[in-house]
Amino acid sequence: MRRTEYTIHCPASPPLTIGLVTDLHERNPAEVLNLLTYAKPDVIAVAGDTLERHKCGENLDKGDSSLASRLVCAGIQISEKLADLRQQKKRDVKAEYGLQFLREAVKIAPVVMCLGNHELYLTDEDRAVIAEAGVRLLDNTSVEIHGVLFGGIPSKQVTGTFHETFLETFSSSPQYKVLLCHHPEYYPYLSRYPIDLILSGHCHGGQIRVFGRGIFAPGQGLLPKYHHGVYDGRLVVSAGCANTASFPRWGNETEVVIVTLENEWPRLTLPATG
């Protein structure tokens, strides 16, 4: 697992460092926590799919109806099902890796979190444990931290639609605004709002990367447009911290992303003249 760093120059924002964690999928969080501890971010943004609260296959937003895309989706469904069968055991909500990660992360920095498609069946017990851990779950809500307004929206598979009232209220704030949204494929819609920065995951970097290009992402299909990196200076897409499918990544390392907000451009230092 690597640490990937991006710097966003934004005159309206106070200087701030954000640790972006996506797609943990209940895997062992030790490496993630080590990277965050070393980076010392001001805020940790957890942008979806931390927990596994779904039924295999039903949460795959296929993105397009082409035969190739449908075949890839079918392969992912089978792979996820096999992984679930191998790991099937009685769930203990208070002992899971995802919740362990949240409890430890709050010791490093304030934690804000949004829901992804794998959290479709988040329970009241889950919400209570998340709140007890000190994590702020942003479910069409927002919170101010260090002068920046953080908001979060869930997967449309959780709600069925966008919460227009929240998006309008959130985006109208004069503060610098950071939105947690698991799905980068929502960006064409969300970009119409004056939101300064959107943090996403979901694509797992395109799963297989060839010459830096992701091959497939749920919700976008083959050769996805938004799969990893920074787009338009407003959208950051993480490759995520883990896999759900049994087949491995290729050319696509897992990562924790560190986003630094700077309100000044670097100064150019000219050589002294005599």
Feature locations, PLM:
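Acidic, histidine-bearing metal-coordination/catalytic regions of metal-dependent phosphoesterases
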Residues: M1-R27, C73
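Core catalytic region of metal-dependent phosphoesterases/phosphodiesterases
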Residues: A30-I145
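Active-site neighborhood of phospho(di)ester-bond hydrolases with catalytic His/Asp-centered motifs
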Residues: G19-T22, V43-D49, P110-N117, L138-N140, ...
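Short active-site segment of divalent metal-dependent hydrolases/proteases
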Residues: E26, L51-E52, E185, G205
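Non-catalytic terminal accessory segments
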Residues: M1-R2, P266-T269, T273
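Binuclear metal-dependent hydrolase catalytic cores centered on His/Asp/Glu-rich metal-binding motifs
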Residues: D124, A128-V135, T141-C181, Y187-Y189, ...
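Conserved beta-sheet core of the metallophosphoesterase superfamily
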Residues: P184-T260, W265-P266
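Beta-strand-turn-beta hairpins that frame and shape the catalytic cleft
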Residues: T7-G19, V135, S142-G152, P174, ...
